[in-house]
């Protein structure tokens, strides 16, 4: 027996993209249904991605800070908790996030359906509930916000108890904590978990399929991360690809195409993502995906079927929770108001939660050089800031790229603790209109003292002193 419901819009997925769309639609008076395949709202971001990994990272960075501070180490024993115990903190944060986000949907009168959604026709979905019951949902518009999952090459046995991806690593038991781990893939996820495991004292082999880390970053920032990893004992192997991954009873051996072999207690595969679209039965409505199952969309996030939108990780780049929410918001405006002029901001900040953090907004030196833009560089080393000295967070720097003639800020790159927060000061000034986005602002404004924000004044003065 099927129960049928009609709505103005159905949103598939309750992560940042789905939430942004649902909230925007509901606030415009639409009747909205949200379908979530997991038992709680929040999506992969809350349950297996951003929230748990950043909660892990925060605890471990504080433990490192405690253990390295001579004031504490002289009088107290160092702290060495397990990955499993720190996960309990992450789970506590997840529960808070779920409760808060569930309340958002309730307050905005969104109808929640927990189960797997699949298309019957372009305007109708079937939802299979956990107890096996079926609901059909009809709507004038549908928003696909199903996110992504770790990419699994067919040649790797992910059922092996010592081979993990970014979802299964969060199920690591206390007795399974490795002393040595191989991380295959040195993208954002791979680098973040390399920091996490090395911070726990685990030996880390980081296998990178490219010639340097995080190639989309400014070269200096990438080099700073590489040096920091090297200085902390992470072994990085660039330009390597696996030929065979061999799961053993007591470990994993990675056979590389270069002829090398690497052995460790376990393998964490972090090389790519794939869109969560297979179960939607898109073939029933003639909607196609690319080879990684990502959907193609217009600048308003419309798919090839104009009444069906897609937002968030299911469309691939930039695969940021922050961007996903805004994509959902923009899609909701297109649906309710027909607005076609709203766009994501041009300069989306990126935050990478390694230890220390990395954050960037705007152009890199390499991009400006290729564009033949006459730019100059201003730098501030954190070790010269009073606040960094007080906090014992002296590793890192801030780098401002600006036009030599107009002094317009072109890019900001930060490596160090709190980088993802610090970057937003520069981002706010970059977005100013009518000539307000110049490096002179940082020289002429007054900063609290002592603060990490002072790095902007130091970097601005450093850059202006280079002009002639």
Swiss-Prot record:
One of its GO terms (biological process) is 2-oxoglutarate metabolic process. GO terms for cellular component: cytosol. It comes from the Bacteria. SUPFAM superfamilies: FAD/NAD(P)-binding domain, FAD/NAD-linked reductases, dimerisation (C-terminal) domain. Its EC number is 1.6.1.1. Pfam families: Pyr_redox_2, Pyr_redox_dim. FAD binds at residues 36-45. It is found in: Cytoplasm. The keyword Flavoprotein applies. Keywords: Cytoplasm, FAD, Flavoprotein, NAD, NADP, Oxidoreductase. Its cofactor is FAD. GO terms for molecular function: dihydrolipoyl dehydrogenase (NADH) activity; flavin adenine dinucleotide binding; NAD(P)+ transhydrogenase (Si-specific) activity. The keyword NAD applies. Its main location: cytoplasm. Binds 1 FAD per subunit. It catalyses: NAD(+) + NADPH = NADH + NADP(+). It is an enzyme of class 1 (oxidoreductase). NCBIfam families: PRK05249.1. HAMAP family: SthA. Belongs to the class-I pyridine nucleotide-disulfide oxidoreductase family. Conversion of NADPH, generated by peripheral catabolic pathways, to NADH, which can enter the respiratory chain for energy generation. This is Soluble pyridine nucleotide transhydrogenase. It comes from Hamiltonella defensa subsp. Acyrthosiphon pisum (strain 5AT).
